[in-house]
Swiss-Prot record:
Role summary: GTP hydrolase that promotes the GTP-dependent binding of aminoacyl-tRNA to the A-site of ribosomes during protein biosynthesis.
SUBUNIT field: Monomer.
Region named G3: 81-84
Binding site for GTP: 19-26, 81-85, 136-139
Family matches, as Gene3D superfamilies: P-loop containing nucleotide triphosphate hydrolases (3.40.50.300), Translation factors (2.40.30.10)
Protein name as it appears in the record: Elongation factor Tu
A GO MF label: GTP binding
Naturally occurring in which organism (per UniProt): Anoxybacillus flavithermus (strain DSM 21510 / WK1)
CDD domains: EF_Tu, EFTU_II, EFTU_III
UniProt-listed Enzyme Commission number(s): 3.6.5.3
Region (G2): 60-64
Domain of life, per lineage: Bacteria
Residues at which Mg(2+) binds: T26
Length: 395
């Protein structure tokens, strides 16, 4: 029998469960698939199937992540769940699982805990735009006032990190009871999914964003000009479009694309995901290089100084064996190239240990096309020692 074709009829949204260890993230993930499976909108996945998450590598870092998919009436969802706290930190910072929104799971019996706060902070820093709250284990709390108190605490915590704490939907339920098939608690899972459907907007598709392509290679074709090759990261490029060559030099250079080819065939246009060669008018071989980007004029600018949220690899992950201090000068790998940068640690932080997750300020020795949310690796002598996400542009 032919394999079922993935019908792209519904808009696609990436979400994930976040929250403190043992508050029920994986149980909730199992409950969502189980309840939706009864409506024929998912394949039921048991707790053990999700918990035994396979390891993946992203930017040289090993991360365990479970992926499940399911549908509601309106959408198709890809949902990520991580077994360990460190996996969440790594996942969010490397962008291995880009989230359009997250379900924050908080145990009603315990209230917000340290990792609850840390995951909210991470969501803010790496640009997870929307959070919906699932207050779990409500079957274990008899006192209605206590539930309201926990809800208020969670809302305050979200507001503290610039999420709209007053507007965020909070669903009170029990993932375990829903998983066991109790109809009253199953209804709460449906209520949660309705809230996710309504509150988390459909993300703008990559192809609808302004054009940008990191340059991987450059060569000249005699009699035709200079070709820059790479994979289109977002947007659409048409023959005749004006683009800017950005990064590694003070001023962007403007040019016109006179040809687009893919697999040696000429195209009228290329879109996000395509590997292409772009023929650039009036650009000599030495005016464009790997590490720069081609972009729609005025949409992205080169910067040298920014704040970033960074995860530092442990020795076991192949990272450093020793801590580092302010003025540490590793290489920052953006998209296709390494640039040296100088690190300044936050006030009161003397050093960073392998395994830490920290915000730092970075100053690059050459400008690179970056924006909030741009991901990078930190490398030293060719090996990855950290991963980061730009949280704020300084200059």
């Amino acid at each position: 029998m032919a394999k079922a074709k993935f019908e792209r009829t519904k808009p696609h949204v990436n979400i994930g469960t976040i929250g403190h260890v043992d508050h029920g993230k994986t149980t909730l993930t199992a409950a969502i698939t189980t309840v939706l499976a009864k409506q024929g909108k998912a394949e039921a996945r048991a707790y053990d199937q999700i918990d035994a998450a396979p390891e993946e590598r992203e930017r040289g870092i090993t991360i365990s992540t479970a992926h499940v998919e399911y549908e509601t009436d309106n959408r198709h969802y890809a949902h990520v769940d991580c077994p360990g706290h460190a996996d969440y930190v790594k996942n969010m910072i490397t962008g291995a699982a880009q989230m359009d929104g997250a379900i924050l799971v908080v145990s009603a019996a315990d209230g917000p805990m340290p990792q609850t706060r840390e995951h909210i902070l991470l969501s803010r820093q790496v640009g997870v735009p929307y959070i919906v709250v699932f207050l779990n284990k409500c079957d274990m709390v008899d006192d209605e006032e206590l539930l309201e108190l926990v809800e208020m605490e969670v809302r305050d915590l979200l507001s503290e990190y610039d999420f709209p704490g007053d507007e965020v939907p909070v669903i009170k339920g029990s993932a375990l009871k829903a998983l066991e098939g109790d109809p009253a608690w199953e209804a709460k899972i449906i209520e949660l999914m309705n809230a996710v459907d309504e509150y988390i907007p459909t993300p703008q598709r990559e192809v609808d964003k302004p054009f940008m392509m990191p340059v991987e290679d450059v060569f000249s074709i005699t009699g035709r000009g200079t070709v820059a090759t790479g994979r289109v990261e977002r947007g659409i490029l048409k023959v005749g479009d004006q683009v800017e060559i950005i990064g590694l030099s003070e001023e962007p250079k403007a040019t016109t694309v006179t040809g687009v080819e893919m697999f040696r065939k000429l195209l009228d246009q290329a879109e996000a995901g395509d590997n292409i060669g772009a023929l650039l008018r009036g650009v000599s071989r030495d005016e464009v290089q790997r590490g720069q980007v081609l972009a729609k004029p005025g949409t992205i600018t080169p910067h040298t100084k920014f704040k970033a949220q960074v995860y530092v690899l442990t020795k076991e992950e192949g990272g450093r064996h020793t801590p580092f201090f302010s003025n540490y000068r590793p290489q920052f790998y953006f998209r296709t190239t390494d640039v040296t940068g100088i690190i300044q640690l936050p006030e009161g932080v003397e050093m960073v240990m392998p395994g830490d997750n920290i915000e730092m300020t970075v100053e690059l020795i050459a400008p690179i096309a970056i924006e909030e949310g741009t991901k990078f690796s930190i490398r030293e002598g060719g090996r990855t020692v950290g991963a980061g996400s730009v949280s704020e542009i300084i200059e």
